[in-house]
């Protein structure tokens, strides 16, 4: 595809990250392909092409990069909370089974994104020898 064609389709992105990296980041962040396609108002086939063969456009990378920044802030904040606690003390974090439950709890992102962030917190905390669990809220 020529640069002119690429520019006409709005797919110019000078970032060196590949479709494989785009897919890996999207999946580890808990962002579904169909969900991203809806969010960006593109055909799901277009989004799948970003995972396998086309360089994703700036606006798709902005979603990915925004989630990465949010997760890093969330991970840093939660790990900082643990710093003052005894290493043997168990930390329990609540995650939500769906977007509706997350919204009711005041979580400002989809449940899958929040779950991905807390999953990373668990990995990082356990790496430091902490005891961490994730739980769903009790049924009402």
Regions found by a protein language model. Name each.
Residues 41, 58-75:
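DNA major-groove recognition helix of helix-turn-helix/homeodomain DNA-binding modules
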Residues 2-28:
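A short, Lys/Arg-rich alpha-helix, primarily the initiator
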Residues 22, 36-37, 47-50:
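Conserved hydrophobic/aromatic packing and binding residues within compact polymer-binding modules
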């Amino acid at each position: 595809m020529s640069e002119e064609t690429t520019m006409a389709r709005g797919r110019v992105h000078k970032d060196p990250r590949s479709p494989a990296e785009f897919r890996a980041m999207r999946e580890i962040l808990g962002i579904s392909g169909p969900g991203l396609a809806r969010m960006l108002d593109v055909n799901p086939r277009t989004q799948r092409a970003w995972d396998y063969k086309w360089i994703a456009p700036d606006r798709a990378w902005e979603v990915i990069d925004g989630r990465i920044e949010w997760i890093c802030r969330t991970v840093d904040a939660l790990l900082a909370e643990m710093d003052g606690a005894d290493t043997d003390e168990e930390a329990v974090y609540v995650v939500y089974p769906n977007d509706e439950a997350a919204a009711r709890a005041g979580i400002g992102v989809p449940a899958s994104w929040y779950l991905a962030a807390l999953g990373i917190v668990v990995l990082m905390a356990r790496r430091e020898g902490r005891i961490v669990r994730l739980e769903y809220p009790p049924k009402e």
